[in-house]
Regions:
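C-terminal catalytic/substrate-binding lobe primarily of soluble NAD(P)-dependent oxidoreductases
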Residues: 1-158
């Protein structure tokens, strides 16, 4: 259940691959959360042959008049059994929709940090979790300044 949104469904997806190389992980899973019936509707349309890609792409166009939100919960359990949870939530605003704000702002903040310190990382592709902890803290604060709600450890807004 998502607070203030109600019951949701979740299905396994793959977006944690960078953690395999950056954090000592024994087991991990990622679920995408959607309204009840969401995935089954698309399975049924696909299986019946009525899934229209052109119509689907038109529906994916951003419409600032359509309210939307992004909600993410990250739970981690340490080897000693300690658990921590972070919740990220955004409802979008005039400058973009919520998913772009929750993911794109991270990239934007990383670029700002890199421009200020080009020697921070060697050339290549780097996941945000490979950044120094003080950089991650600044990125979290930038996201909070932009109105993205982040609740959990290390999210004190200074």
């Amino acid at each position: 259940e998502v607070p203030e949104k109600g019951d949701m469904e979740a299905f396994l997806t793959d977006g944690l691959r960078s953690l395999l190389n950056s954090i000592p992980v024994i087991e991990m899973s990622e679920y995408t959360v959607r309204w009840p019936g969401h995935i089954q509707m698309f399975i049924d349309k696909r299986d019946s042959g009525v899934l229209d890609e052109v119509d689907l792409q038109a529906q994916w166009q951003y419409d600032s008049k359509t309210p939307e939100f992004t909600w993410m919960e990250v739970m981690a359990e340490a080897f000693d059994g300690r658990r921590v949870t972070w919740t990220v939530q955004d409802h979008g605003c005039d400058d973009g929709h919520s998913m772009a704000r929750c993911t794109g702002l991270v990239t934007y903040c990383c670029i700002i940090e890199w421009l200020e310190d080009p020697d921070m990382l060697p050339p290549g592709v780097h996941a945000p979790e490979s950044l120094p902890s003080e950089v991650i803290s600044r990125i979290i604060n930038m996201m909070l300044d932009e109105g993205v709600e982040i609740i959990g450890p290390m999210t004190s807004h200074s």
